[in-house]
Amino acid sequence: MKLGRAVLGLLLLAPSVVQAVEPISLGLALAGVLTGYIYPRLYCLFAECCGQKRSLSREALQKDLDDNLFGQHLAKKIILNAVFGFINNPKPKKPLTLSLHGWTGTGKNFVSKIIAENIYEGGLNSDYVHLFVATLHFPHASNITLYKDQLQLWIRGNVSACARSIFIFDEMDKMHAGLIDAIKPFLDYYDLVDGVSYQKAMFIFLSNAGAERITDVALDFWRSGKQREDIKLKDIEHALSVSVFNNKNSGFWHSSLIDRNLIDYFVPFLPLEYKHLKMCIRVEMQSRGYEIDEDIVSRVAEEMTFFPKEERVFSDKGCKTVFTKLDYYYDD
């Protein structure tokens, strides 16, 4: 309302001021102020604007990760530092590219949601956040050439409209090999590609590929009596990137994005243990407005299946199905 009254005041004062000075020059100056300064800010009060939450709060992002992502000390640290550093860099050399790997239910999709919500008010529903699902948007191998053209046009058009666009590619392990290489020029160290800068855009890839390698490392630590929190990125990252690159069932199979080192971070999501499932269940109870009932928490967690068969250390579905299982106990 204060801004509205200020604009109205300028409009009411304009006739008398213009009479006292040069009508044309002052009129143009006033118009410039209204259109160049006030209008965009007034518009952004009622509609989402590109980069409207660019003053990303490190504390808010960390709180979202701490409160909602469990058993993923590596992912938390990488995401927090990479995203915060990138958004607060006025002149990045290239787009930020994150490749998130792990079994279903470990938090990959949830992290992409957290990132989107911390940058744009609309989160995944923002006009500046674009989600591609391999099996939905690129189903037919025979249409790869068409998909490549469409993908390039879509990204070019949206980055032209908003430099801070976010592109999320889900089910990379189900994407046809070679397709994702179409976006290679946009991820490289170019100031401009056909007159468009992609350096402030963000690309996030989600995949189950490489999950076996991540599990091997986590299981080795467990069998050695080491804490999972002792796992370092260097223990996994190189082996993970090689595994994904050589996986014929992955959209990254022999991809130039990996070969040219254009993926900034391969982010491993560790398989979840029994205690992490209980954390997920408690958060879901709270989100539904229920008091935490530890008996129900334990019963739901115990209904989940675990692997390896002998040791039963890790949940084979992560936290993905605990929410639906919780419905059984609250059928009112």
UniProtKB/Swiss-Prot annotation:
One of its GO terms (cellular component) is extracellular exosome. Changing residue 205 to I: In DYT1; increased identical protein binding; decreased ATP-dependent chaperone mediated protein folding; changed nuclear membrane organization; decreased neuron projection development. It holds the Pfam family TOR1A_C. It comes from the Eukaryota. Residues 251-332 are annotated as: Interaction with KLC1. Residues 312-332 are annotated as: Interaction with SYNE3. The keyword Transmembrane helix does not apply. One of its GO terms (molecular function) is identical protein binding. The keyword Chaperone applies. It is a peripheral membrane protein. Its EC number is 3.6.4.-. Widely expressed. Highest levels in kidney and liver. In the brain, high levels found in the dopaminergic neurons of the substantia nigra pars compacta, as well as in the neocortex, hippocampus and cerebellum. Also highly expressed in the spinal cord. Residues 91-251 are annotated as: Interaction with SNAPIN. InterPro entries: P-loop_NTPase, TOR1A_C, Torsin, Torsin_1/2. Protein with chaperone functions important for the control of protein folding, processing, stability and localization as well as for the reduction of misfolded protein aggregates. Involved in the regulation of synaptic vesicle recycling, controls STON2 protein stability in collaboration with the COP9 signalosome complex (CSN). In the nucleus, may link the cytoskeleton with the nuclear envelope, this mechanism seems to be crucial for the control of nuclear polarity, cell movement and, specifically in neurons, nuclear envelope integrity. It is linked to Dystonia 1, torsion, autosomal dominant: A primary torsion dystonia, and the most common and severe form. Dystonia is defined by the presence of sustained involuntary muscle contractions, often leading to abnormal postures. Dystonia type 1 is characterized by involuntary, repetitive, sustained muscle contractions or postures involving one or more sites of the body, in the absence of other neurological symptoms. This is Torsin-1A. It comes from Homo sapiens.
